[in-house]
Curated annotation (Swiss-Prot):
Belongs to the RNA polymerase subunit omega family. This is DNA-directed RNA polymerase subunit omega. GO terms for cellular component: DNA-directed RNA polymerase complex. The lineage of its organism: Bacteria, Pseudomonadati, Pseudomonadota, Alphaproteobacteria, Hyphomicrobiales. The keyword Transcription applies. Its EC number is 2.7.7.6. One of its GO terms (molecular function) is DNA-directed RNA polymerase activity. It comes from the Bacteria. Promotes RNA polymerase assembly. Latches the N- and C-terminal regions of the beta' subunit thereby facilitating its interaction with the beta and alpha subunits. It is an enzyme of class 2 (transferase). The keyword rRNA processing does not apply. The RNAP catalytic core consists of 2 alpha, 1 beta, 1 beta' and 1 omega subunit. When a sigma factor is associated with the core the holoenzyme is formed, which can initiate transcription. One of its GO terms (biological process) is DNA-templated transcription. It holds the Pfam family RNA_pol_Rpb6. It comes from Agrobacterium fabrum (strain C58 / ATCC 33970).
Length: 129
C-alpha cells in the first residue's frame, strides 16, 4: 500500500492549510455517502480524499467552491440586473402612474436618541421566560 503524504498533494494545492480544509471536506463528503473516484484499498476516508487530490481525479477549485457553499448560511442568488436603457424608458413611462412615494427617514441627534432610550419603559416581568 502506497502512503499518501502532503508532499504528494502540495503541487496540486499550494497552501497546506487549504489542502487540509479541502481534504477534510472531501472526507466528510465520502463519509456521507459520496462516491469515491479512486480505489479504496482498505484506506480510511481522509487518505482516500488525499489520494483523490493527488491523482487529480477531483479539481481542487471544485472542492473549494463546494466547501464555500457548504459553509454559507445565506446563498446569494445572482439575478440579472435590468438594462439601464430599459430602466430609463420605464421611468419616463411610469411618471403618470401612481407610484409609491420614496420613503424618507427623519434624522435624529445623539441626544434625542439617548433621551428616547431613557424614556423607554421596561416590560413587566413574567414567569414565561
Amino acid at each position: 500500500m502506497a502512503r499518501v503524504t502532503v508532499e504528494d498533494c502540495i503541487d496540486k494545492v499550494d497552501n497546506r492549510f487549504e489542502l487540509v480544509l479541502l481534504a477534510s471536506h472531501r472526507a466528510r463528503q465520502i463519509s456521507q455517502g459520496s462516491s469515491i473516484t479512486v480505489d479504496r484499498d482498505n484506506d480510511k476516508n481522509p487518505v482516500v480524499a488525499l489520494r483523490e487530490i493527488a491523482d487529480e481525479t477531483l479539481s481542487p477549485d471544485d472542492l473549494k467552491e463546494d466547501l464555500i457553499h457548504s459553509l454559507q448560511k445565506h446563498v446569494e442568488v445572482d439575478e440579472p440586473e435590468p438594462d439601464p436603457v430599459t430602466l430609463a424608458a420605464s421611468a419616463a413611462d411610469g411618471e403618470d402612474d401612481d407610484q409609491p412615494e420614496t420613503v424618507t427617514f427623519d434624522q435624529m441627534s445623539e441626544e434625542e436618541l439617548l433621551a428616547g432610550i431613557e424614556g423607554l419603559v421596561p416590560p413587566e416581568k413574567n414567569d414565561d421566560y
